[in-house]
């Protein structure tokens, strides 16, 4: 049994204010769970050719800011935001990375959007669950807030394969594989 086969998971977390553009943790999660056949929606590697957020585009946006070209910046970021929120729309669950030391404007909008749709939003807080913002505990079942990637991975494996799971009034599964 693999409840998560062909489910779409959105990898949500800061990109523009982190050194690696948010790539490393996303690649780690994808490789650690490759056997679950999850279809990952990754904003660092979008399955679409618009709203791309690579190093080149990030540097271009920073140049626009520096030059005061806010019209161009707004036009480009509205497209990025549109594509990213669309990925939240079509995903089945979110994996969210929160670092309390990094301002993550889009991350909180995407998390809020996914939560309003009652999607499972698995939040990993780098500083640990005990340091997670209090607001998160009012938004999400605390069982979806984690301190480490190992906990997130173990939880997803539990959801995918164990006979008895708590759906937390969020998980909904369609059997695409016939297993």
Regions found by a protein language model. Give the residues of each.
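Conserved catalytic or regulatory cores that recognize and/or transform ribose-phosphate-containing ligands
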Residues: 1-179
């Amino acid at each position: 049994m693999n409840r998560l086969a062909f489910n779409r998971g959105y990898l949500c977390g800061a990109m523009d204010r982190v050194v690696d553009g948010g790539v490393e943790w996303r690649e780690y999660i994808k490789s650690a769970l490759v056997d679950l056949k999850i279809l990952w929606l990754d904003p660092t590697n979008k399955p679409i050719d618009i709203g791309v957020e690579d190093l080149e585009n990030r540097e271009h946006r920073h140049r626009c800011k520096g030059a005061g070209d806010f019209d161009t910046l707004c036009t480009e970021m509205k497209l990025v935001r549109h594509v990213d929120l669309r990925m939240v729309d079509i995903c089945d669950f979110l994996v969210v990375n929160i670092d309390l030391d990094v301002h993550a404007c889009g991350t909180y909008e995407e998390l809020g959007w996914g939560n309003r749709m009652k999607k499972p939003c698995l939040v990993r807080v780098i500083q640990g669950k005990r340091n997670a913002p209090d607001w998160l505990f009012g938004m999400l079942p605390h069982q979806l807030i984690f301190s480490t990637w190992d906990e997130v991975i173990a939880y997803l494996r539990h959801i995918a394969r164990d006979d008895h799971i708590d759906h937390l009034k969020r998980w909904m599964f369609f059997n695409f594989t016939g297993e």
